[in-house]
Amino acid sequence: MLIDVKPLYSEIKNLIMDRMSKLKKVPKLVAVTYKPDPSTISYLKSQEKAAKRFGLDYEIFEASNSIEVLEKLRKLSEDKSVNGIFVTHPLPELDEMLVFENLSPEKDIEGRHPYNLGMLMYGNEFFAPCTAEAVVKILENVTEITGKNVVIIGRSTTVGKPLATMLLRRDRSATVTVCHTKTRNLPEITRNADIIVAAAGKARLVTKEMVKSDSIVIDVGINVVDGKIVGDVKEDVSEIAKVTPVPGGVGRITTALLMEHVVKSAEKMNF
């Protein structure tokens, strides 16, 4: 069975639009990129369309060199007309920590800044990483998380690690196991899970044999195989478990939350 996230998306969007109606000015999101590849360009175009659907002002700044990236981030961080900054990754020739040193955590709508990740550890985050937050929103919409055995496949700072932290919070109290592609006996571990979150970036990694019946599988993966977008979960897993689709699942909610973060920043800035 596939999990339909459209009602959740509509609910989030309606709440955002209601909050936007109370603002004095239109919130603004600026995306900063450098030497973007075709997939990055495609993503930014889809992000621009999403911003327009939500009624946000949107700009793309393509830097001509790495120094210009840092200069632009500093300027945008100080610009009171800008509420959110999105930085495409990876940025050639630039250390990620150097990027964050020039980016205000209050405008880091992706929740990737070390300050925001640190606050997440204390359960006092302003921005959580959008994809991890999207997974939590979906899970809370379809099941009770407390006491469930959750296996996360993936250990990135954008999904795996922050998601584990969010699920361990006292108000959620899941039992969390974090695995990765080098984990021994991975099928043995996943078969005991009530919930599996596949975020390893490996196409069709999770198979039917790795999943127990009636479990919930959240597919975060986006991979291209023979020109087709596929997830980290093999398609037939939906025959025995509840699975989020790819595309149109986690990514849809992630986009909505990215826009919500821009509005949240605008509210804090008394826009």
Swiss-Prot record:
Keywords: Amino-acid biosynthesis, Histidine biosynthesis, Hydrolase, Methionine biosynthesis, Multifunctional enzyme, NADP, One-carbon metabolism, Oxidoreductase, Purine biosynthesis
InterPro entries documented for this protein: Aminoacid_DH-like_N_sf (IPR046346), NAD(P)-bd_dom_sf (IPR036291), THF_DH/CycHdrlase (IPR000672), THF_DH/CycHdrlase_cat_dom (IPR020630), THF_DH/CycHdrlase_NAD-bd_dom (IPR020631)
Cleavable signal peptide: none
Gene3D superfamilies according to UniProt: Leucine Dehydrogenase, chain A, domain 1, NAD(P)-binding Rossmann-like Domain
Pathways involved: One-carbon metabolism; tetrahydrofolate interconversion
HAMAP family per UniProt: THF_DHG_CYH
Subunit-structure text: Homodimer.
Official protein name in the record: Bifunctional protein FolD
Record organism: Thermosipho africanus (strain TCF52B)
Annotated gene: folD
